[in-house]
């Protein structure tokens, strides 16, 4: 009986998170309020707070989903690809693809949806970006060990550039109302970024 109830609670939490992400996909939605969310779900605001202690906790749930999705793909890339340079390429491409497929979550990634929210949410996004940068730095070091990059290559600066590129593409995607495809010029831009 308790397992069935826990599953139902989990389903309701997931539905709330999915609804927030869907609402964020609408460029006209400036801010998701609990009142708007409750109206969309056809429940009371009190019903939302039975599942999440605060709105910040709802966004934390979205960030956890983003982390899980991004890093599971990165782990698959690292396991499947031996070339450090190809790992870096695939990781950045996967970040752009994630934005393409998850428009609402991209607004969370660029901080657009977090304006006027708890500052710890932006700190979580910053930590996520730092982890991605560390992963890219490691892939670039592997590329150097394989002879694809010079030993004196500045791995930190290169990894930072790749993260800045991805964040910039996400930003353009969001600010264009999801019209400027993050992967539009990827095949032409990667050779420049790889150097």
Please give the residue ranges for each predicted region.
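C-terminal peripheral helix-coil segments that are non-catalytic and often amphipathic
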Residues: 1, 90, 94-101, 134-146, ...
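Basic, helix-initiating cap at the start of DNA-binding domains
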Residues: 1-27, 31-40, 57
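Amphipathic alpha-helical segments enriched in hydrophobic/aromatic and basic residues
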Residues: 5, 24-27, 33-34, 45, ...
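Short hydrophobic/aromatic patch on the recognition helix
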Residues: 42-52
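Hydrophobic alpha-helical connector segments
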Residues: 61, 75-103, 155-162
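Amphipathic alpha-helical packing segments from all-alpha helical-bundle domains
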Residues: 68-71, 75, 119-146, 156-160
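Amphipathic alpha-helical segments used for helix-helix packing
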Residues: 99-120
């Amino acid at each position: 009986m308790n397992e069935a109830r826990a599953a139902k609670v989990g389903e309701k939490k997931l539905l709330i998170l999915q609804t927030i992400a869907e609402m964020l996909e609408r460029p006209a939605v400036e801010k998701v309020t609990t009142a708007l969310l409750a109206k969309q779900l056809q429940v009371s605001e009190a019903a939302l707070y039975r599942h999440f202690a605060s709105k910040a906790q709802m966004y934390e749930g979205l960030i956890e989903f983003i982390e899980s999705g991004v890093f599971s793909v990165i782990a698959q890339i690292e396991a499947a690809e031996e070339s450090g340079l190809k790992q870096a390429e695939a990781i950045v491409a996967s970040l752009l693809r994630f934005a393409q497929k998850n428009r609402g979550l991209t607004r969370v990634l660029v901080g657009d949806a977090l304006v006027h929210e708890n500052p710890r949410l932006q700190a979580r996004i910053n930590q996520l970006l730092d982890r991605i940068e560390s992963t890219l730095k490691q892939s670039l070091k592997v590329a150097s060990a394989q002879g694809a990059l010079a030993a004196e290559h500045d791995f930190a600066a290169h990894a930072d550039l790749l993260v800045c590129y991805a964040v910039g593409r996400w930003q353009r995607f969001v600010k264009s109302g999801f019209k400027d495809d993050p992967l539009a010029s990827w095949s032409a831009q990667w050779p420049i970024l790889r150097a």
